[in-house]
């Protein structure tokens, strides 16, 4: 029989390998078992007036603002309706393009891609706020940490809240018609206190909050799901390791689900 110590080592190794910043054993087990199922919540389809068996597809483009090429491709896809919605990283150098595009296309579904990590090798950024106001979120180069574990380990909750609110405020001040928030790399979905803060920010700003079904393990009798938290029954994203030439096949292969 597997020992408790060995089980803990296996669990810790699993989360470390997958860069999942979960340090509470009970919560870790919930994530592993995926103990919260879509049946626990009224489906998004039902909320929109469809039957629970109807399948709705949302094709979402995040990381707007990352690079001019990302912007131009995403803008074209949004205008052609091949992409349903998109969200903007407000800590990058190309957000003016997004603001201009939003002004010309005010009915588009655009959100703020709340960002607290900087994982790219050639694209690095810090926060919207001054470095002195968010020291716990920054490395020695005054940039966000490159992975979610370090962010979760070192971040101060007040500084996180202030930075995320500043990102929303900046988007609104630039004329972006913000409809929702989501989380870059899912960094805000693991720590219970940070996750609650994420949902509270959505409520405070009268925005919808994207929640993948995996993150709904946080909800229980002491923390019921708020109405503005929109749970997606299934969530698919091409992960690292999938070659560019294989992207089309990846998405076509999930189309039958």
Task: Give the role of each language-model region.
Residues 3-58, 69:
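N-terminal pre-catalytic segment of deacetylase/amide-hydrolase enzymes
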């Amino acid at each position: 029989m597997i020992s408790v110590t060995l089980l803990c080592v296996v669990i810790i190794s699993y989360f470390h390998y997958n860069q999942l910043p979960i340090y509470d054993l009970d919560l870790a087990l919930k994530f592993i078992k995926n103990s919260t199922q879509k049946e626990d919540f009224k489906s998004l389809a039902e909320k929109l007036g469809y039957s629970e068996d109807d399948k709705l597809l949302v094709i979402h483009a995040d990381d707007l603002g990352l690079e001019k090429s990302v912007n131009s491709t995403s803008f074209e896809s949004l205008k052609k309706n091949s992409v349903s919605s998109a969200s903007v990283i407000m800590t990058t150098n190309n957000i003016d393009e997004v603001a201009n595009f939003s002004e010309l296309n005010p009915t588009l579904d655009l959100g703020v891609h709340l960002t607290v990590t900087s994982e790219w090798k050639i694209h690095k950024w810090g926060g919207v706020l001054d470095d002195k106001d968010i020291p716990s979120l920054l490395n020695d180069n005054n940039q966000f940490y490159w992975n979610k574990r370090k962010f979760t380990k070192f971040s101060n909750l007040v500084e996180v809240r202030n930075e995320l609110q500043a990102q929303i405020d900046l988007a609104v001040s630039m004329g972006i018609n913000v409809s929702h928030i989501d989380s870059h790399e899912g960094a805000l979905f693991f720590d219970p206190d940070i996750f609650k803060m994420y949902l509270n920010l959505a409520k405070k700003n009268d925005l919808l909050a994207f929640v993948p079904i995996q993150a709904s393990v946080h909800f229980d009798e002491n923390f019921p799901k708020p109405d503005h938290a929109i749970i997606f029954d299934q969530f698919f994203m091409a992960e690292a390791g999938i070659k560019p030439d294989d992207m089309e096949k990846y998405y076509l292969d999930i189309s039958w689900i």
